[in-house]
Design a protein with these regions (language model features):
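Core, highly hydrophobic multi-pass alpha-helical transmembrane subunits of bioenergetic inner membranes
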Residues: 1-230
Length: 230
């Protein structure tokens, strides 16, 4: 159900739900996705699942900070919360080109949120066996992984809208969307898993500092523009 709530953010041509704070709603729903996973693991009454919960909480706290800061930088640049205005802002300039470092960090953060290789540490390490789905089979197993892949499809759409500024019914949008999905799927068979301590170190020592630098830089640019023109 929470995975379905994400699609309310998608700016359909005939979408009657004209949300003003779409980006804020997006962050809120993404954050809610963690709680069903925690409940599913806790109900399974399995030691491996409990270990997965502990690892999940620390990992989510670390990288949700990056996700929130990147979205905040985007809001600071466009000075609006609507995805449609985000498209209008990128008609002549694409975020993919002049803040490409944030684009790469955003992809890493999404891979962690989606539990994809090489960051599927909460369910992929040998000491955790299979993570939270260890005690589930048949319908429950299908529902768990169906929600995961629904999130995968939606997040790639939001990524293209935020950083590419593509019209969401165009041929180029669909083509780049399929290419991104293909890359995301084949990553599982190409990359090796990173060590957990390295993952946390990269977040708090390297990536967070870089994102904060961009935040301060963008804020100073906006202040300078305001002083010059107003």
């Amino acid at each position: 159900m929470i995975s379905s709530m994400l699609w309310l953010v998608y700016p359909w041509i005939y979408n009657n739900l004209n949300m003003i704070y779409r980006l804020v709603y997006l962050l809120f729903v993404i954050r809610l996705n963690v709680y069903p996973i925690i409940i599913v693991r806790w109900v399974s009454i399995n030691n491996y699942s409990i270990l997965g919960i502990i690892r999940l909480i620390s990992q989510i706290i670390s990288f949700e900070v990056l996700l929130f800061l990147i979205i905040f930088i985007i809001i600071l640049i466009i000075e609006d919360y609507k995805l449609k205005n985000l498209l209008y802002y990128q008609i002549n300039r694409k975020f993919f080109f002049y803040i490409y470092i944030l684009y790469l960090i955003f992809i890493i953060t999404l891979l962690i949120d989606l539990n994809r290789v090489p960051f599927d540490l909460i369910e992929g390490e040998s000491e955790l066996v299979s993570g939270f789905n260890l005690e589930y089979y048949r319908r429950l197993f299908i529902f768990i992984f169906l929600s995961e892949y629904i999130n995968l499809l939606f997040i790639r759409i939001i990524l293209l809208i935020i950083f590419y500024g593509l019209i969401y019914w165009s041929l180029i949008f669909n083509l780049i969307y399929l290419i991104n999905l293909f890359i995301l799927v084949i990553i599982r068979g190409v990359l090796a898993r990173i060590r957990y301590d390295y993952l946390i170190y990269i977040c708090w020592i390297e990536l967070l500092v870089l994102v904060l630098y961009y935040l301060i830089y963008m804020y100073q640019i906006k202040e300078l523009i305001y002083i010059i023109y107003y």
